[in-house]
Curated annotation (Swiss-Prot):
GO molecular function annotation: 2-methoxy-6-polyprenyl-1,4-benzoquinol methyltransferase activity
UniProt pathway: Cofactor biosynthesis; ubiquinone biosynthesis
Localisation per UniProt entry: Mitochondrion inner membrane
Quaternary context: Component of a multi-subunit COQ enzyme complex.
Keyword Endoplasmic reticulum: no
Protein purpose: Methyltransferase required for the conversion of 2-polyprenyl-6-methoxy-1,4-benzoquinol (DDMQH2) to 2-polyprenyl-3-methyl-6-methoxy-1,4-benzoquinol (DMQH2).
Protein residues bound to S-adenosyl-L-methionine: 109, 154, 186-187, 203
Listed name of the protein: 2-methoxy-6-polyprenyl-1,4-benzoquinol methylase, mitochondrial
GN (gene name): coq5
Catalyses which reaction(s): a 2-methoxy-6-(all-trans-polyprenyl)benzene-1,4-diol + S-adenosyl-L-methionine = a 5-methoxy-2-methyl-3-(all-trans-polyprenyl)benzene-1,4-diol + S-adenosyl-L-homocysteine + H(+)
Amino acid sequence: MLQSLNRSVRYLSTSIGSRLYCSNTNQTTKNNTNASGVNDNQQTHFGFKTVNKEDKESMVKDVFDSVSSSYDLMNDVMSMGIHRLWKDELINTLNPTPGSHLLDVAGGTGDISFRFLDKIKTSPNYFPNINKSNNGGGEVLKSSSLPSSATVFDINQSMLNEGKKRGLNKGYTDQSDPSIDWVQGNSEQLPFKDNTFNCYTVSFGIRNCTNIDQVLREAYRVLKPGGRFLCLEFSQVPNPLLRFAYDQYSFNVIPIMGQLISGDRDSYSYLVESIRKFPDQETFVQMIQDAGFKQVTYKNLTFGICSIHSGFKL
């Protein structure tokens, strides 16, 4: 059954892929520092619920503890496989080269980091380490290209554990070339020095953070001058008719899928609600600018169901 499902997902991804990209937009709008609509400084939203800020982190952790083992399959089912094309577009937009060091926040199971490392290896300027046999032993001839790495950062250890398994199957470790490592922590308090990374990505994760403004400030802090911030996130569909159809699917179908595949309807209901609470495209542009980033732009994918926001530390 799962093989048939995966074949269907791949077919839908291919057939719909030509309609993926809809618009590129540069926007500067009024600031909305409390996009959740919650006015109390001690409160925030958890889906459509209002909760204490100190409680949200553990509540989000519980959600991803519950869905970690089925997360990748659910992404395929919920998006009909299109999330793979969205993630490919994120990496194509970044276009990393050898010598790049990525911080992949909310990187969970490694989807973005693996694409990043694969892209590095296709660069004409990439030359891998070579194992040379020598009397039954072996020595490693170091690559002449600049070292590259990805650091997957996530608040949820269960998601990281799933990612590590996938990384080993792909041959990516902290000793591979290029390399990957896995760090658990809070994106509002990154355990990295200033000016450490060339690029920072966050994919379908920033909407789950308690203090998005602080997450953006931390992103700015750890990027090197000239570094790039990229965020792939579900957004707001501008067309009213399409938005209505999307809402019907999201609220009535996705939770049922969650129940059938992972046995957890409530977690997927939260994920749908969290999408609706996330700021619209133009408001998020202003939030990124307020964190210090320049040349902030976004482009909508698949009619605005999600968008890629970009900014530079200049």
